[in-house]
Amino acid sequence: MRLVVGMTGATGAPFGVRLLENLRQLPGVETHLVLSRWARTTIEMETGLSVAEVSALADVTHHPEDQGATISSGSFRTDGMVIVPCSMKTLAGIRTGYAEGLVARAADVVLKERRRLVLVPRETPLSEIHLQNMLELARMGVQLVPPMPAFYNNPQTVDDIVDHVVARILDQFDLPAPAARRWAGMRAARAAARSFGDAA
């Protein structure tokens, strides 16, 4: 499998980094990474990692302005793309076909080739414009996976919350997520809640 991973300047860089770490552990998955200019700043602020360290998690890293990159052409076969986190600017550009920069261009290619496109939009609150853009993209077949925390699995740390969101992203591509703590029914949930309460 060959996946394109885009990261933009919206807050939520830990989700993108954790996704890359997971994908790197999966045999047969080739990753192509594009970091927007502001993603580079956000990564350093939110993760403490350098751009070089994050880039090293991918098989191939493309410059954000390289419109001649392989992933800017539909003839370069991929299985899809995920943008995590996805800024509202990038989301709006994808919705309107305004492919400024390689992140948006690669997404435009995935759309026109009818491949799987997953966006992880990071903004709150959402305006009517944001919601309209997301609705139109959903109608085009784009998967929108907002990084919303789940509490039925009793997360103990921020890492637990990040892992859950990343597992849901991996699910969109039918890829395994070993760290996922999945819903196992009400009985298991109640037992976990009691255990959590006892520990507290």
From Swiss-Prot:
Keywords of this entry: Aromatic hydrocarbons catabolism, Detoxification, Flavoprotein, FMN, Prenyltransferase, Transferase
Uppermost EC category: transferase
InterPro entries named among the record's database cross-references: Flavin_trans-like (IPR036551), Flavoprotein (IPR003382), UbiX-like (IPR004507), UbiX_pad_YclB (IPR032901)
GO biological process: catabolic process; response to toxic substance
UniProt EC number: 2.5.1.129
Taxonomy, superkingdom: Bacteria
Reactions mediated catalytically: dimethylallyl phosphate + FMNH2 = prenylated FMNH2 + phosphate
GO MF terms held by the record: carboxy-lyase activity; flavin prenyltransferase activity
The keyword Mitochondrion is annotated on this UniProt entry: no
Binding residues annotated for FMN, in chain numbering: 9-11, 36, 87-90, 122
Subunit structure: Homododecamer.
Family: Belongs to the UbiX/PAD1 family. YclB subfamily.
NCBIfam families cross-referenced by the UniProt entry: PRK06029.1, ubiX_pad, VdcB
Function: Involved in the non-oxidative decarboxylation and detoxification of phenolic derivatives under both aerobic and anaerobic conditions. Flavin prenyltransferase that catalyzes the synthesis of the prenylated FMN cofactor (prenyl-FMN) for phenolic acid decarboxylase.
Stated name of the protein: Probable UbiX-like flavin prenyltransferase
Organism in which the protein naturally occurs: Streptomyces sp. (strain D7)
Gene name, Swiss-Prot/TrEMBL: vdcB
